[in-house]
Swiss-Prot record:
This is Forkhead box protein A2. The gene is foxa2. Acts as a transcriptional activator during early development, limiting the extent of mesoderm formation in the gastrula. Binds to DNA via the target sequence 5'-GT[AC]AACA-3', with 5'-GTAAACA-3' being the preferred binding site. PANTHER family: FORKHEAD BOX PROTEIN, HEPATOCYTE NUCLEAR FACTOR 3-BETA. It is found in: Nucleus.
Length: 434
């Protein structure tokens, strides 16, 4: 350290001209008292404030003290403390090398050499804060928070779109449009994610391609959920699949395949049964290209396998309704072997599709679900017990107490209409796309 000071000693004029303006400090002792309180500082300040005759020795002592003390300084970093000592040593060596320089100028030089580093250290928190609080360029943000990527997989998005549709089937362009309407993130880079949607539809067994019927002209085939796929997502939460659906064999029109296709339509959603029932009842038995043609053929196969009377087979509409009511009763036992058939919670989860849609859509979507009414009652009671009634729920305190204590009182309460129920849960959608 001292060798470096001796080597740079002849540049004392450069140092004094570089830090030209003297900083005004009351004494070196006050400045060091703020840094730490050890007895070395007392000696350092006394030696710096000694008479002009002893100034060179004092400043030399100052350089030694600063060099040895630099790791223990509290206000300054060790490297800066060493630099301060070097600057002081340069100033004191200048008083040795140039006899024409008075000891007072050496003191001023040592003060000037010491002052800028100390000044820089005292200003460094302000510099740091200004760097932290500096306003960022808005271009550095990729997008705002409302346009962040949704936490759903592509299979979840497709399943949501298909399940909310009235006929439980959508074309590819309708799936695209539904996703873009609900999630603003997917309004950009459409080519990338739409390619992934097509791959997900093609390579997953839970999605079936349904040919377009002549009574529905247009472009593109329909996509629907496999009737056996069941409740793929945990309690209607689309964030995680509980089981990957795999077809054991390709569904055929034989008896086994027909039974496989006919079962499980209510595990996708209860409205699928009512819509398929009405479509089977309305269409003629010879229109083989109806949207539910696989299910109709499977029902005919089931009819032939059960050996019903020929006069019963003359009315295929009543036949289909009868078979549908039959396989409704069998469905609960068969579905337990595949996936958990917990439909009670399927459509009223914080991340479910009903809470993403507005209340009008929910009312329209669940218009056919009057037979699921008691399940919605259970959900409302659970919501009141768990103290979630603050989300815009118009229920009074007495009604909330009756949900906890008296279940029959709840079922006769005025909350039993669909519109009041859904407007009570959420008056507006959680993720609106505006």
């Amino acid at each position: 350290m001292l060798g470096a000071v001796k080597m740079e000693g002849h540049e004392a004029t450069d140092w004094s001209s570089y830090y030209g303006e003297p900083e005004a400090y009351s004494s070196v002792g006050n400045m060091n008292a703020g840094l730490s309180m050890n007895p070395m500082n007392t000696y350092m300040s006394m030696s710096a404030m000694s008479t002009s005759a002893n100034m060179t020795a004092g400043s030399m002592n100052m350089s030694y003290v600063n060099t040895g003390m630099s790791p223990s300084l509290t206000g300054m970093s060790p490297g800066t403390g060493a630099m301060t000592g070097m600057g002081t040593g340069v100033a004191s060596m200048a008083s040795h090398l140039s006899p024409s320089m008075s000891p007072m100028s050496a003191q001023a030089t040592s003060m000037n050499a010491l002052a800028p580093y100390t000044n820089m250290n005292s200003m460094s928190p302000i510099y740091g804060q200004s760097n932290i609080n500096r306003s960022r360029d808005p271009k550095t943000y990729r997008r705002s928070y409302t346009h962040a990527k949704p936490p759903y997989s592509y299979i979840s998005l497709i399943t949501m779109a298909i399940q909310q549709s009235p006929n439980k089937m959508l074309t590819l362009s309708e799936i695209y449009q539904w996703i873009m309407d609900l999630f603003p993130f997917y309004r950009q880079n459409q080519q990338r994610w739409q390619n992934s949607i097509r791959h997900s539809l093609s390579f997953n067994d839970c999605f079936l391609k349904v040919p377009r019927s002549p009574d529905k002209p247009g472009k593109g085939s329909f996509w629907t959920l496999h009737p056996d796929s069941g409740n793929m997502f945990e309690n209607g939460c689309y964030l995680r699949r509980q089981k990957r659906f795999k077809c054991e064999k390709k569904p055929s029109l034989r008896e086994g395949g027909g039974k496989k296709l006919s079962e499980g339509s209510s595990s996708v959603g209860s409205a699928a049964n009512s819509s398929s029932e009405s479509s089977v009842g309305n269409e003629s038995p010879h229109s083989s290209s109806s949207p539910c043609q696989e299910q109709k053929r499977s029902l005919v196969d089931m009819k032939s396998s059960q050996g019903l009377s020929p006069d019963h087979a003359a009315s295929p509409a009543s036949q289909a309704q009868h078979l549908l009511s039959q396989h409704h009763s069998v469905l609960s036992h068969e579905a337990q072997s595949h996936l958990k058939p917990e439909h009670h919670y399927s459509f009223n989860h914080p991340f479910s599709i009903n809470n993403l849609m507005s209340s009008e859509q929910q009312h329209h979507h669940h218009h056919h679900h009057n037979h699921h009414h008691h399940h919605k009652m259970d959900l409302k009671a659970y919501e009141q017990v768990m103290h979630y009634s603050g989300y815009g729920s118009p229920m009074t305190g007495s009604l909330a107490m009756s949900t906890v204590t008296n279940k029959s009182g709840l079922e006769s309460s005025p909350i039993s209409s669909d519109t009041s129920y859904y407007q009570g849960v959420y008056s507006r959608p959680i993720m609106n796309s505006s």
